[in-house]
Regions:
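Intrinsic low-complexity, repeat-rich intrinsically disordered segments enriched
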Residues: 1-18
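Extracellular, repeat-based ectodomains that mediate carbohydrate processing or recognition
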Residues: 13-365
Length: 365
């Protein structure tokens, strides 16, 4: 295999209805192979932070600064010299820290988390903490800004159950409560979204029992409880799940590859939280590719649009694609997708910079 350059591009919404998008210049944030990239916005420092596994498999973080339609990056900082898979990052706005959850392959594949502190264009890390002393996969992470807690959802490989745990950041460390099972079936592609209107955590996932499914969680202290799971795509697997909260319409939006009949650029669906349950509108197709994978979402609050990126397949070629959606009631309208990278694009993530009013798209190519 050759070296893969990981690049970040700034996506600028034009505000058209239905919304389309324009793409700024591309900047490398790593000069080596990278995988499992995940990104977030640090609003206290007005920085984008990307977490990923570098060419050695080392867990790495890098800080980006948006200026106009470009993004520049500081020097990458290693947070783990073990192979670090399933990296997922979130910003803790109560403590002004980022938290990265990952599978530590050098420590029996345990689920592990670490706290990062941004300073200027660099980032420093505390000591890693194990949150699941068992083989851990398919990690998603979110932040509950009402309870001021981090929530990590993951597949515990020993049981294959979908499991969640609440984390409390203190300084440069994090401690955890007791894990809670939200799905007693094989749970994959766990995506965590916080609904700030209802102060609920929504975990979306695909499982053998009910395929595309979501569970609503309520954080109390250092624990979380879940309502009854609701299927949003009950007949087929919903892979490469991602989620975002539209704070204008107060809706959760999910984006996924509709397997095994993914003859389109994936599907998106609008969810409405009520109490400890969630209901869904009708799923809408995204793009026109013959398959989709590596989906990513962000909400652009400056124009109230959902940005959605994915890897699409067209006549033997993989392309990086981008579309924009507008939520209305329980439905979403999606504009025609554009190409942001005319080459194979994977490990895609999106983060909205509310200072610059731009969504930063990170990907491998």
């Amino acid at each position: 295999s050759g070296s893969v350059i990981v690049q970040g591009g700034v996506i600028t919404n034009t505000g058209l209805i239905p919304a389309s998008a324009s793409v700024g210049s591309t900047t490398a944030f790593s000069s080596t192979t990278a995988a499992y990239s995940s990104s977030t916005f640090d609003s206290s420092n007005n920085k984008i932070v990307v977490a990923y596994a570098d060419n050695n498999g080392y867990g790495t973080g890098v800080v980006g600064t948006v200026s106009g339609n470009t993004v520049s990056y500081g020097t990458p900082v290693v947070f783990s010299t073990n192979f670090s898979y399933y990296t997922s990052i979130v910003y803790d706005s109560a403590n002004n820290r980022v938290v990265i959850a990952y599978q530590d392959a050098g420590n029996s594949n345990y689920g592990t988390a670490i706290v990062g502190t941004v300073s200027g264009t660099s980032i420093s890390f505390g000591t890693a903490v194990v949150f699941n002393a068992a083989y851990t996969q398919s990690i998603g992470i979110g932040f509950d800004s009402n309870a001021n807690k981090v929530v990590i959802a993951y597949r515990d490989v020993g049981t294959s159950y979908g499991t969640a745990i609440v984390g409390t950041v203190s300084g440069t460390s994090i401690s955890f409560g007791t894990e809670v099972v939200y799905q007693s079936s094989n749970s994959e592609y766990n995506a965590v979204t916080f609904d700030s209107s209802n102060n609920k955590i929504v975990v979306a996932y695909t499982c053998a029992a009910t395929n595309g499914t979501a569970s609503v969680g309520t954080v109390s202290g250092t624990s979380i409880s879940f309502g009854t799971a609701v299927a949003f795509n009950p007949t087929r697997s919903s892979n490469y799940l991602s989620g975002a909260f539209d704070s204008n319409s107060n809706k959760v939006v999910l984006y996924y590859s509709d397997s095994p009949t993914a003859a389109i650029g994936g599907m998106c669906v609008v969810g409405t939280v009520s109490g400890t349950s969630i209901s869904f509108g009708t799923a809408v197709a995204v793009g026109t590719s013959t398959s989709s994978s590596f989906t990513a979402l962000s909400f652009d609050s400056s124009v109230n649009k959902i940005m959605m990126a994915y890897r699409g397949y067209f006549s033997g070629t993989y392309l990086g694609r981008l579309a924009v959606g507008t939520v209305s009631g329980t439905s979403i309208t999606v504009a025609d997708a554009i190409t942001f990278n005319a080459a194979n694009s994977y490990y895609i993530s999106l983060a909205f910079d509310s200072n610059a009013n731009k969504s930063v798209l990170s990907y491998s190519s």
